[in-house]
Amino acid sequence: MSPTNVQVTDYHLNQSKTDTTNLWSTDDDASVMEAFIGGGSDHSSLFPPLPPPPLPQVNEDNLQQRLQALIEGANENWTYAVFWQSSHGFAGEDNNNNNTVLLGWGDGYYKGEEEKSRKKKSNPASAAEQEHRKRVIRELNSLISGGVGGGDEAGDEEVTDTEWFFLVSMTQSFVKGTGLPGQAFSNSDTIWLSGSNALAGSSCERARQGQIYGLQTMVCVATENGVVELGSSEIIHQSSDLVDKVDTFFNFNNGGGEFGSWAFNLNPDQGENDPGLWISEPNGVDSGLVAAPVMNNGGNDSTSNSDSQPISKLCNGSSVENPNPKVLKSCEMVNFKNGIENGQEEDSSNKKRSPVSNNEEGMLSFTSVLPCDSNHSDLEASVAKEAESNRVVVEPEKKPRKRGRKPANGREEPLNHVEAERQRREKLNQRFYSLRAVVPNVSKMDKASLLGDAISYISELKSKLQKAESDKEELQKQIDVMNKEAGNAKSSVKDRKCLNQESSVLIEMEVDVKIIGWDAMIRIQCSKRNHPGAKFMEALKELDLEVNHASLSVVNDLMIQQATVKMGNQFFTQDQLKVALTEKVGECP
């Protein structure tokens, strides 16, 4: 990672996602990271002259936690948040004005996308581009971990478009007045772009690239020390509440406002165990920090990218020579996995975590270190250490987070209470119009008379309904009485018919039965009317009598049936069998 010649390369976000594989590549294929973080033996030509006194710097002790709390505490689904920090920079080699205000990477927090937003994407990155992204992530992790290992495991997961866009953002800087953050900072205003058309039609190259990489909303809110940028893969309408929260969180002169009162609750030990949340002291030098590229505009109108700069590490308190001892450029700590501290691995269970976070775990963390003098770094580090040991950490009071009501589908959220009241009155008037349409007789056109007429009409409908119910009950009673009378008449006729038929059967039918052990001989002589043959067979079946022989003959109207049967489980006497056959064969149909 220490080539002989210094390579200075400008990297621009391409218009098409298909060309993004060249975003990090250089002519030298020896290392992917040459394009992102390079080095050289002679760095004096890359450093600008001594800048004027710097602008007021932000307190980065909890800058990333503020970004995290801003996203996690919002009702909307924001994908990432970036703080662009203002500083006096070097605008270009041909520009003698060294008092140019630059907006460079201060810190960032990547939350990730919702599952439904990922499913909506119809143009995923190609296999080659995805492999390129994973390779860059593995190189970065290998660089951060010092080649100890874990880079291959950390770069196996898929890198989404929004994650790649967030990662590339750390190589960019903006001159005041150019680009989306630069315009917002120059005008001290808020720029809110919502929808693909708004992003695609923007004059800012970064906004157009955000739309290509799947963003639907980009917001830049100017603060005293920089610009807070938020992006989302969903369409989010403008909200004054978010702007107020940004003003409260990033007002560093007043201590950041009520940051502790509603910030996203973090585990107290998380800051020590999670490298993604390490925040450097403003004037201190922490071990394990990695110097990252210096932001440079390079004469671009909108977006400029970093030149390759040497990597300097401060491990275990040791000092490192700086090519320019008078100036220590802004450094960045790039955390791609949890578990790296002082150049060593923390725990084997953290090796397999992805460099790019999912919604459930991890995040991308890029933390910058404020400019400091390299000659006094050891002294300031010891002072910062002593101040850190004497500082009493007071946990912020936990308060419930406000949850506002979201508008229903198809409705836009009102901007203020006046708009909300107007919408409520319009809705009420629409309902009065609907009520007036269904009430037949309206005495007057005012609302009070309309309500009175509606009440009278409802009472009239209730009385009609009760009358209809009573009439229905009366009719049902009459039907029940008639059905009962008809049933009685039918039963009397049937009984009479049965009696007549029974008397005739008793007179006409003759049954003769002879029992020999378990066998019986049966002879029945009767009229052939009403199917006596079928009845005889049915009777034998019901009495469980097995037929050995049967015969049937008809002479005129007389039917003679003979059968030889064998008794089954039950034994019948001659009289019992005769009575049973008489009842079953001679019963009424």
From Swiss-Prot:
Bias (Polar residues): 309-322
Highest rank taxon of the organism: Eukaryota
Region (Disordered): 114-133, 291-326, 340-359, 381-422
UniProt-listed GO biological process terms: anthocyanin-containing compound biosynthetic process; defense response; extracellular ATP signaling; positive regulation of DNA-templated transcription; regulation of DNA-templated transcription; regulation of secondary cell wall biogenesis; stomatal complex development
Coiled coil: none
Region annotation (JAZ-interaction domain) ranges: 99-150
Residue ranges with Basic and acidic residues bias: 381-398, 409-422
Entry-linked SUPFAM superfamilies: HLH, helix-loop-helix DNA-binding domain
Domain remark from Swiss-Prot or TrEMBL: The JAZ-interaction domain (JID) (99-150) is sufficient for interaction with MYB proteins and most of the TIFY/JAZ proteins.
Function according to Swiss-Prot or TrEMBL: Transcription factor involved in jasmonic acid (JA) gene regulation. With MYC2 and MYC3, controls additively subsets of JA-dependent responses. Can form complexes with all known glucosinolate-related MYBs to regulate glucosinolate biosynthesis. Binds to the G-box (5'-CACGTG-3') of promoters. Activates multiple TIFY/JAZ promoters.
Protein's name according to its UniProt entry: Transcription factor MYC4
Native organism taxonomy: Eukaryota, Viridiplantae, Streptophyta, Embryophyta, Tracheophyta
